[in-house]
Regions:
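Conserved ABC ATPase "signature" region
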Residues: 114-132
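A short, flexible loop at the N-terminus of ABC-type nucleotide-binding domains that lies
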Residues: 1-6, 10-26, 74-75
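Helix-to-loop junction immediately C-terminal to a conserved catalytic motif
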Residues: 54
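Catalytic Walker B motif of ABC-type/P-loop ATPase nucleotide-binding domains
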Residues: 161-165
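Conserved beta-strand-loop-alpha-helix hinge in the C-terminal portion
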Residues: 212-232
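Conserved ABC transporter NBD signature motif
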Residues: 62-73, 78
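Conserved ABC ATPase signature
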Residues: 136-140, 144
């Protein structure tokens, strides 16, 4: 598995007229497990932590390394290694049709249009979306849109997939479908979630509270800690 390292990484933001606010306290972590969960309340800093891993957010202190690559200095190279799946697939689906959206992900790696189209169709088929290749992305169900967004991420063959609350907008059936798809991946998975059943499937779970990692344990142990925080 790849190695993700946070070496004194923290995030502060400037607030006009109010100085700075700490979003994520200085954090030291080495993540090598195949399935890593991140849980915490809304606004706890868990999404900030996840976004550090592919450079969507840059640390204001310390550094983040992915297989030895500094995210702040080697952002383009890191983003080829780390695919990111957002909560709302609308943040990722920008082309008119499904096949065009996957082709967009492949535009740098496959220059020939016919070859790119063929590969995009293979990717869609792998996610049960081949019959929707020429459909508008807006005609898909919520679960299908999230699977399409994930397909676009996986098309570039990353070694790590970071999924930031990918099932928050989905019903139970689609939540199960997307979650099972994520856990079937060969890639290392970092899953930010409110779904404690999904978190329990992870090898390691980080609990984030008030901008700090307050627990770093196995899935069941970390969830028990988190539930204790919520029930205080």
């Amino acid at each position: 598995m790849p190695t993700i390292q946070l070496d004194g990484a923290g995030v502060r933001v400037a607030l006009p007229g109010r100085g700075e606010r700490e979003i994520l306290s200085v954090t030291d972590l080495v993540l090598t497990e195949r399935r890593i969960g991140i849980v915490g309340a809304n606004g706890s800093g868990k999404s900030t932590l996840a976004r550090l891993l592919n450079g969507l957010v840059r640390p204001t202190s310390g550094r983040v390394l992915v297989d030895g690559l500094d995210v702040a200095r080697r952002g383009a190279a890191v983003r080829r290694l780390v695919g990111f799946c957002f909560t709302d697939p609308a943040a990722q689906l920008v082309m008119p049709t499904c096949v065009e959206d996957v082709e967009l992900s492949l535009r740098r790696s496959i220059r020939d249009a016919a070859t790119r189209r063929a590969r995009a169709m293979e990717v869609l088929a792998g996610h049960g979306l081949a019959d929707h290749a020429h459909d508008s992305v807006h005609s898909l169900s919520g679960g299908q849109r999230q699977l399409l967004a994930l397909a676009g991420v996986l098309a570039i063959e990353p070694t790590i997939v970071v999924a930031d609350e990918p099932t928050t907008l989905l019903d139970r059936a689609n939540t199960r479908r997307v979650t099972d798809t994520l856990f079937a991946l060969e890639q290392q998975l970092v899953l930010v979630t409110h779904d404690l059943e999904a978190a329990a499937r992870c090898d390691r779970v980080l609990v984030v509270d008030g901008g700090r990692v307050v627990a770093d344990r196995s899935g069941v142990e970390a969830i028990a800690h988190y539930v204790g925080l919520v029930d205080r």
